[in-house]
């Protein structure tokens, strides 16, 4: 099955941030000039909705499983085990990732963390036992970058997506940091 990736479908899957504050502030200060301002569509709507988001999440998730550093052949035993023994859970993970992106982009779907933690997204608890190192996190970010390149996402949007992803590094690597403190 060949997937058709467009800028819209890629951004739908990975763009996790709303419009930058500077753009919104400028829009608020612009004179109305006798016209009513159109209400801005949510990021979810602008990016194509759940089906576009799901297609991109699917591609990215499969790429991570196949990645030699963080996937099935990882030197990290927890990652390797998850990507081999729990591979049957991947469809559910794709579903959860899709809900998460839809939720944070203003869509109608509500993401609820399966392992709530200190943050509403529960990323630290969901990843704690995987003991993901900062270098492994960076490799997943690089895989995301390769996915965005594959889909021909423009440089500015790619940078925004990667910045949004990087914002969760401390949460995702919390289990690794705790392990290092214990030794």
Each model region followed by its residue ranges:
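C-terminal segment of classical bacterial N-terminal signal peptides
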Residues: 17-24
